Amino acid sequence: MHHDDFSLRALHDALDERRRERNLSWTAVAAEVNRLRTKLRPIAVSTITSLRHKPVGEGDGILQMLLWLGKTPESFVPGMADADSAPYRLPTLATGQILRWNTRALFDALNAERASRQLTWTGLAREIEGFTPNMLTNLSRGGRTGFPHVMRIVRWLGHPAVTFTRIARW
């Protein structure tokens, strides 16, 4: 892990602190994180509790945990100034909505910035550690991404993470 990566351990610790403050079990935390869910598979208790030791976490699930905490992705990146200020805040959702990463928008921004800097995909992969050129170009297909890697892309682009999210039906 890079010293300036999104910290899954810090996220786990924040979830655990809120859980203890509210005297909740991990099962109750998972139920609250999943509170807006209608028919898709819920985020499992083990997905939340395993963040303490995992090197990588599923991106959309972590967004739901951040929403429950009322925190931004940037607030778990060391050294991010004003990480909880308005430009970084995640939206408020209604029942049946889920916040997802918009990996196609992430690809489009990445490709545009790559071209403006006259970088090849190989050169870009060298600048954003932990990625191969194929991993970066595969973002164009949409689909899932994970933490902490996605935040390396977001930081390289210099835009708030929320810029690359979308509200979908849950």
Give short role names for the model-derived ranges.
Residues 29-30, 45-51, 76, 124-125, ...:
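Conserved hydrophobic/aromatic packing and binding residues within compact polymer-binding modules
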Residues 32, 68, 127-128:
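Residues within the alpha-helical elements of helix-turn-helix
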Residues 34, 53, 81, 129, ...:
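Residue-level detection of the helix-turn-helix DNA-binding "recognition helix"
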Residues 42, 46, 50-67, 142-155:
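Short, basic-rich loop-to-helix N-cap that marks the start of a DNA-contacting helix
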Residues 63, 67-87, 158-170:
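Short C-terminal boundary/hinge segments that cap the last helix of small helical domains
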